[in-house]
Structures are given as C-alpha cells and as structure tokens.
C-alpha cells in the first residue's frame, strides 16, 4: 500500500472496518482452486458492509494473499447474509477536512478495485 494510502487509513480511527476473509475451495476435475473473499463488518444487516480506508486495506491484503498463490483458477467475492456491500464509507469521509486525504481515499478505492481485473 502506498504511503498516501497508509495516511488515509491512519486518519480515520473510528471506521467500522469491513474485514475481507479468504477461504479456498478445490474445484472439480483438477481445475485448480477457487478463492472466495467474504466481506463482513461484524454488524448485522442494518449496518451494511462499506469500504472505508481500513476496509480497503483489508481487501487489498486479501488480494495480495490470493495473488501470491499459483493454483488460483477463480476468485469470488460475497458479503454477509442479506447484503453484499453498499460502496464507499461516506460516514468515515464526513470526518475528514483535508481534500488531499479525500483524494487519496478515492485513489485507494480505485487501485484496490482495479486489482480484480488482474486475476
């Protein structure tokens, strides 16, 4: 993660963090392994999972873990029961007054999501 992205994570201390957990499943007929990322912020469905800076960092770490393997044939992503995710954590950004941090947050989101195209 870039230095500016790390600054975004440090500057949002009260974020409800969406964790990205990876499980692996062997595909039939020797087709390889599927990595399944589950997004969950630890809250019930009334607080949907969002992507704040630390949540994006967690997703980025999960993608790093998957990218380090040579047996991955498919990557899937799912959410907690009843809801997938609603997008950027705008409540976290409402606490930020520095436009450079807000821009870094947007760049971080684009950088992490772009990685899905690398698989």
In which residue ranges do the predicted regions lie?
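Conserved CoA-thioester-binding segment of acyl-CoA-metabolizing enzymes
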Residues: 1-78, 114
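Glycine- (often His-adjacent) and acidic-residue-rich active-site loop
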Residues: 41, 50, 78-114
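Internal glycine-rich, Lys/Arg-flanked active-site/core loops of soluble domains
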Residues: 119
């Amino acid at each position: 993660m870039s230095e500016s992205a790390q600054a975004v994570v440090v500057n949002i201390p009260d974020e409800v963090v969406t964790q990205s957990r990876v499980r692996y499943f062997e595909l039939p007929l020797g087709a390889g392994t599927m990595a399944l990322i589950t997004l969950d912020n630890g809250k019930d469905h009334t607080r949907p999972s969002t992507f704040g800076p630390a949540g994006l960092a967690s997703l980025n770490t999960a993608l790093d873990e998957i990218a380090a393997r040579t047996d991955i044939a498919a990557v899937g992503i799912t959410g907690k029961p009843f809801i997938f995710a609603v997008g950027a954590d705008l409540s976290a950004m409402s606490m930020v007054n520095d436009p450079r941090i807000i821009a870094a947050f947007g760049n971080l989101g684009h950088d992490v999501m772009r990685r899905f195209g690398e698989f």
